[in-house]
From Swiss-Prot:
The organism's place on the tree of life at top rank: Bacteria
Organism: Mycoplasma pneumoniae (strain ATCC 29342 / M129 / Subtype 1)
Protein name: Putative MgpC-like protein MPN_367
Ranges where the record places region Disordered: 1-59, 118-145
Pfam families on file: MgpC
Amino acid sequence: MVGSGAAGSASSLQGNGSNSSGLKSLLRSAPVSVPPSSTSNQTLSLSNPAPVGPQAVVSQPAGGATAAVSVNRTASDTATFSKYLNTAQALHQMGVIVPGLEKWGGNNGTGVVASRRDATSTNLPHAAGASQTGLGTGSPREPALTATSQRAVTVVAGPLRAGNSSETDALPNVITQLYHTSTAQLAYLNGQIVVMSSARVPSLWYWVVGEDQESGKATWWAKTELNWGTDKQKQFVENQLGFKDDSNSDSKNSNLKTQGLTQPAYLIAGLDVVADHLVFAAFKAGAVGYDMTTDSNASTYNQALVWSTTAGLDSDGGTRLW
């Protein structure tokens, strides 16, 4: 994702992530050794991780020199806890600050926040003029939340309590409370976290963090195709990205950078999840992109892609221009 470099709000959305399909690792953190029987509180520096006991408390120092995360676990949570620490390390390597997570106490046993506006304004800092809805900058506006969409967007405070649903995880998911001055938006859908506007990866439009089920590690990879929505929507997003890639291989994921195209056609000004649909808003014309498929017989081979309008994309309804 092309980074805007401006401070923004992180619209943190929850899912358990345990049903994510195996993903190829573009950036993989080193394993973290977690002893099964320690009871002391220790501080973990993500830049220099150390073994952590059942009560891991990591603070975020002034100036953001070290990313931080606070996670509570029991002795039986060793494997899952290690997975979250690996996720935090990967995020830190990408320049994303993981704020301290407080133990989630729930709300009447449900863990559901009334509205995302309340959740984001209470738990995460906002830049001046930044939207609290995840739909780009401008006047904050709250979309109507159905029972389904509310479940998808209300996780800023932490995960659901253990035992509330089949999607509950006993540990806080470090992905649910992310903030960085150059990370404008986050969204969660179908077991994947979409991270846009990271200044540390300026040659790519957006990234997805997922969990490799085989290794249990968090993996970073360039998301160049959406796995949900219609074919029309997928084609539109692939065009916006400037190239098409149907695989998650490291070589193809780095195709954009290695071929010298560092500015895709549009900048995505915002994204959100509403009623279980991923919504991109305010594509802005910025440059020329190319479909970099290696198949010379493809209809879009080396096709130049240029736009001069502002367009929106809904994963349910396709594209619309205004």
